[in-house]
Amino acid sequence: MTYPLDRLPQAGGLTPPQLFADGADLPTISKLAEDPMIDGFTTNPTLLAKAGVSDYEAFARSALEVVGDRPISFEVFADEPAEIVRQARLLAGWGDAVFVKVPVTTTDGTSTHDVVAELAADGVQLNVTALMTPRQVAVVSAALAGGPPSYISVFAGRVADAGRDPLPIMAASVAIMAAEADQRLIWASPREAYNYVQAAQVGCQVITMTADLLAKLPTIGKDLD
């Protein structure tokens, strides 16, 4: 489900993106799982550490129990290709709703293209993350082609933090992925509620938001007079 945009003149007739909740606090995930507006969930190692998660699998299995059949992303901790593959297969085995997050590069900047292609060919549902450019999107989309349903997460907020307009990058990413029906683009690392509107404007299918940003969405279209 989505929040309507018809109260905004600049967004009339646009299709709102699906909403994913971003976080690793289990009570918050449980609460948001009761909200019909939430279409899926994402987590990452930074959020896990912030939430004090010490047993990754126990946390993940508890989260899977409350989110039902909605997609939820769990990220690998590994930074070496063979270990990324091993961890990804392990995480994928935790449930049918699991999408395994794999960063687009390792910490030394090496592309994970081959890892992504191998996992996709093996039927692992992936959420390739931390992308910043349309070139990266094109490479990842090609690696995922022919595999199971997948997501590509572009860090639009970090693009904006670098002083660049994320809209052309997101629009180009949408165009690159248009031919791949099983691939969906995620507007990741949003900084404000207005990013929800911007995602709709460029045709981005999904936006993932932390609980504090999700709480602001009902004010979209509010009369400012």
Regions found by a protein language model. Give the residues of each.
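Active-site beta->alpha loop and helix N-cap motifs at the rims of alpha/beta catalytic domains
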Residues: 2-8, 13-30, 34-38, 42-118, ...
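Catalytic alpha/beta core domains of metabolic enzymes, predominantly
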Residues: 110, 117, 124-215, 221-225
